[in-house]
Amino acid sequence: MHNTDVLIIGAGPVGLFAIFQAGMLGMKCHVIDAQEVIGGQCITLYPEKPIYDIPAYPKIAAADLIKQLELQAAPFNPVYHLNQQAVELKKEGEFFEVKTSKDIVIKSKVIVIAAGAGSFGPNKPPLANIEEFENESVFYFINNRSKFTGKNIVIAGGGDSAVDWAISLSEIANKIYLVHRRDKFRAANESLRQLKDIAESGKIELVTGYQLDSLEGNNSELQSVIVRDLQNNTRKLNVNILLPFFGLKQELGNLVNWDLDIKLHHIEVDPVYYQTNISGIYAIGDVAHYSGKLKLILTGFAEAASSLHHAYGKVFDGNALHFEYSTTKYTQ
């Protein structure tokens, strides 16, 4: 059995920043994550995707952000339990005991759930032969941007991922078709402005009012994507690559058995300290929900700070926390 002050479930960007915040307050951390490496979706799904809303970084690749967060947390010697899930929860007096899928038991006074989307996988479009092209011509995630250099690409979707990747890949692709069933995209205003400018240049063609209909090709090599509008009109787009970005399936796994207040795959928390309905268990980042929640990495960072300052009194038996700025408290 391992003993620690704080158990963090999830080693994505918000979980990593929670390690730093706990360390600044003198609390030791163990961390559980289902992936083989730390970083969550930033590493597993889009390591090269540029992120624009991290303070002091006008633009930073997701993998580089994780590297910096890992360095920031490292002085506090977190213990990572990777490639395993949190399975069972028991309360023994003032302590929680969590058992992992590898039968490791971790005992702590506080649990911080920073599980992001939980266990995740892509929502795939219902195309008859799509599996034939997967990993050769059809990709749901991008972890090597350079492989799309000079390609003709269909990007399907209307959210941030579709818009941001269309903008990014327009720098290296030959031609991009951005296909969306509606005529409006759901993305940041600045991203929409950039998309409009690039579309006017001809590097991106907006194919709105259409949905994916079928694929044509041979031996895993895509030759064209057929799209269809509401009037049953079709267009053939001659492309090498299809990138469907229709979001992720979210599953919280065994967390649903922990008597937490869960609604629509999110954990309900109070909007001040982000504590769940179980005292001593907090939820932060994308997995947490409260009125007015913004799903931003930046928001998760703030939630990590507030929740761990509140957790200090639970770890140290009600002792008052004397607030100090990091400049006076910590010298690396």
Swiss-Prot record:
GO MF: ferredoxin-NADP+ reductase activity; flavin adenine dinucleotide binding; NADP binding
Xref: Pfam families: Pyr_redox_2
Main EC class the enzyme belongs to: oxidoreductase
Cofactors (names): FAD
Positions of FAD binding: 33, 41, 46, 86, 120, 286, 327
Keyword terms of this UniProt record: FAD, Flavoprotein, NADP, Oxidoreductase
Cofactor binding annotation: Binds 1 FAD per subunit.
Highest taxon above the source species: Bacteria
EC number: 1.18.1.2
Catalytic activity, as annotated: 2 reduced [2Fe-2S]-[ferredoxin] + NADP(+) + H(+) = 2 oxidized [2Fe-2S]-[ferredoxin] + NADPH
Repressor recorded as keyword: no
Subunit structure: Homodimer.
Record-stated family: Belongs to the ferredoxin--NADP reductase type 2 family.
HAMAP family: FENR2
Name this protein carries in UniProt: Ferredoxin--NADP reductase
Originating species: Rickettsia bellii (strain OSU 85-389)
